[in-house]
Amino acid sequence: MSIVKKLIKDHKMIPHPEGGHYVEIFRNDDVTHIYFLLEAHENSHWHRITKTETLHFYSGSPLNVYTSKDGVEFQIDEIGSNNNFMYTVEKGTWFALKSTGAYSLIGCTVAPAFEFEDLELAPKAVSYTHLRAHETLG
C-alpha cells in the first residue's frame, strides 16, 4: 500500500470540497484543526474563508501556497523547506495549494472555529487557470 493510501486509510480521511483529502482532528468553539493531504495530481482550488488559517507542514514534499488579497496580484510561498514549516493566511485572502512532489501532508488550524459556510470556492475554471498561470512565479 502506498504511503498516501495508508495515510488516507489510517486517518480515515475523506475528500475535501476544495480538493485533496482531510480529517478533522480537533474542534471546540475557539479553534479547529484538520490533517489535509494533497497528492501530486491534485491541487487545492482557489478559495477563501472568513477566518484566519495557519498551515503546518508535516510530511512529504514541500507545498506551494498561492495567495492573492485582490485577485490581481499574486504571491507564492513554500512550506516544508528551508526551515519554513508554517504559513498563516489572513481571513478573506484567496489561496490555493499545490504539492511540489508525490504528496504533501499538512495541518490546518482555523480560529475562531471553521464552519463550511465560512468557505467560498472560486469557480473551478478560474481556479485552474490562475493556479497554472502563476505556478512558475515561485
Model-derived features with residue positions:
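Short acidic, Pro/Gly- and aromatic-enriched capping/linker segments at domain boundaries
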Residues: 2-14
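A short glycine-rich, His/Asp/Glu-containing loop-to-beta-strand
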Residues: 20-40
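Short histidine-centered beta-strand/loop micro-motifs
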Residues: 25-26, 44-49, 66, 77, ...
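Glycine- and acidic-residue-biased ligand/ion/polar-headgroup-sensing regions
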Residues: 40-41, 50-69
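Portal/gating segments that form or line small-molecule/metal binding sites
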Residues: 65, 73-83
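Conserved metal-binding segment of the jelly-roll/cupin
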Residues: 82-100
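A short hydrophobic beta-strand segment most commonly corresponding to one strand
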Residues: 102-118
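Conserved small/polar residues in nucleotide/adenosyl-binding loops
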Residues: 129-136
